[in-house]
Design a protein with these regions (language model features):
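Extracellular beta-strand/beta-solenoid scaffold signature
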Residues: 111-118, 139-147, 162-168, 189-199, ...
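Acidic Gly/Asp/Thr-rich repetitive segments characteristic of extracellular carbohydrate-active
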Residues: 45, 49-83, 88-89
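Extracellular beta-strand-rich solenoid/capping regions of secreted or surface-exposed proteins
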Residues: 72, 87-100, 108-129, 133-153, ...
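Functionally critical loop-and-helix segments that line ligand-binding/catalytic clefts
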Residues: 32-52, 284-288, 328-338, 343-459
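Right-handed parallel beta-helix
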Residues: 126-226, 235
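Solenoid scaffold repeats with emphasis on beta-solenoid/beta-helix
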Residues: 80, 90, 97, 107, ...
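Secretory targeting signatures
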Residues: 1-52, 56, 70, 99, ...
Length: 459
């Protein structure tokens, strides 16, 4: 810390001694409300009756008691209809084949806890409505419910349970996974599980309306590009979504709740993350969204609620963090490790323990635009009623830095002495201490739906 910082701290301590033990006022409505019980509407992954009969695979006018036998007899473009229970592992090596259950969950393929249950090695294969379960346990050989090694595969309305990896898509293009339920093994520790959907050197995949739980990471990207993930729900795992070395991908309208981290975006660029929800992700790391070594990406319109850190920004450069709701997180935004050149505007910071915290030795000027962010605790004055505060706001200035480093000082957070320092920092550059500066704070929150998280715990 520099000498100026010590001088400011000394002034605060002296002022506090004069005003006595003044504690901050409490908003009783905030104390009485909590988002802790919020949950999304998710399926019971095991609430399904097992087909009672032995399996029958129908190919045209022929019937087989083995899926593999039917696949071996099929030609390109054929459809095989499945009903009942099959205890086997299947390899689909004929292009254009469709395997579909007579009704959803009306056919089970049980792998007997050995290896991958269904392996697709041909192009243009469709697998629909089938319950796939009991893969092997060996992550070193990628034991999976479904292993896709053929382009343009479509996996639709599957139930994939008690598996190491749910769906592994490796080095192929154009895969679709939609309306599918994936659940791993509850008796396997989280760190030892596979991922729900694992994308390896994959391009142009579409992942839509899937429900994923009890895995390590819900959707894992590794050198994957051009992937669209929309409408998926991930809960009870390490990371809901995890990017590594994966550029030019889009996440939209996904929900991640009750995980360690909702969305972990790492070592990637040109990502678009829009209109997603991250709630109550408060495990060891505890981030709604983690941006680590991410560049030139858009984080827009997301709702980050009840996490340890709503948004944790680590060595991230040149990103747009715009129009997000940050509600009731321990820290709204935590920025560190040289993150800079971010446009941060149009966000609503409401009822967070700390709105923002910056580990920096310099001043971060957010929003070089016509609007800033809404800070619920800012007491913004807008004399000309243009919606923009008349003075800048320091959400992470001298006082916030002191309280973060010396928690015992929180008792004086709303004292006249602390308010005087905030006013000086906001009104004119007398105290240009390190931290965050919002040059054009908003008078009203852009998000008028934030109370919905209290009114209805089922999203």
């Amino acid at each position: 810390m520099n000498e100026r910082y010590f001088a400011v701290v000394a002034a605060i301590v002296l002022a506090c001694s004069l005003v006595g033990a003044v504690v901050s006022a409490t908003d009783e409505s905030q104390q009485d409300e909590s988002v802790a019980d919020w949950s999304a509407d998710v399926p019971d992954v095991h609430d399904v009756a097992e087909p009672p009969d032995d399996g029958v695979a129908t190919l045209g006018d022929r019937e087989f008691d083995s899926v593999q036998a039917a696949v071996d007899a099929a030609g390109p473009g054929d459809t095989i209809v499945l009903e009942g229970r099959f205890d086997e592992r299947v390899t689909v090596d004929t292009p254009g084949v469709t395997l579909e259950a007579l009704e959803r969950d009306g056919a089970v393929i049980d792998g007997g806890e050995g290896g991958t249950v269904v392996e697709i090695v041909a192009d243009d294969v469709t697998l629909e409505g089938v319950w796939i379960r009991n893969s092997g346990y060996d992550k070193n050989v990628d034991d999976s419910g479904v292993f896709v090694n053929g382009s343009n595969a479509t996996l639709s309305a599957l139930r994939v349970t008690d598996v190491a990896f749910g769906v592994w898509i490796g080095s192929v293009d154009g895969a679709t996974v939609e309306d599918t339920i994936i659940a791993g093994r509850e008796d396997v520790p989280t760190a030892q599980r596979g991922n729900g959907i694992h994308l390896w050197e994959t391009t142009d995949a579409e992942l839509t309306n899937n429900s994923i739980t009890i895995v390590r990471d819900g959707i894992y990207y590794q050198w994957a590009e051009g992937v669209v993930a929309e409408g998926n729900t991930m809960w009870n795992m390490r990371y809901g979504v995890h990017y590594m070395y994966s550029n030019d991908n889009r996440l939209e309208n996904n929900v991640a709740f009750d995980n360690d981290v909702g969305f972990a975006l790492m070592v990637s660029s040109e990502l678009t993350m829009r209109d997603n929800v991250a709630v109550n992700n408060d495990g060891t790391s505890g981030h709604g969204i983690l941006l680590k070594d991410v560049e030139d990406s858009e984080i827009v319109g997301n709702e980050l609620v009840g996490n340890d850190n709503g948004l944790f920004v680590y060595n991230a450069l040149g990103n747009r963090l715009v129009d997000n709701l940050l509600l009731e997180n321990d820290v709204g935004v935590h920025t560190t490790a040289g993150s800079s050149n971010e446009l941060v505007a149009g966000n609503s910071f409401i009822r967070n323990g700390e709105a923002a915290f910056a580990e920096t030795n310099s001043q971060l000027n957010w929003n070089g635009s016509e609007r800033g962010n809404y800070w619920a605790e800012a007491r913004t004055v807008d004399v000309d009623s243009d919606g923009i505060g008349d003075t800048r706001y320091r959400p992470a200035g001298t006082v916030e830095r002191l309280v973060h480093e010396r928690p015992q000082a929180a008792a004086f957070a709303e004292s006249p002495a602390f308010d005087a320092v905030r006013m000086a920092e906001s009104s004119f550059p007398v105290l240009e201490s390190p931290g965050i500066v919002d040059q054009r704070p908003l008078a009203d929150p852009p998000h008028d739906n934030w109370r919905d998280y209290y009114a209805d715990h089922d999203h």
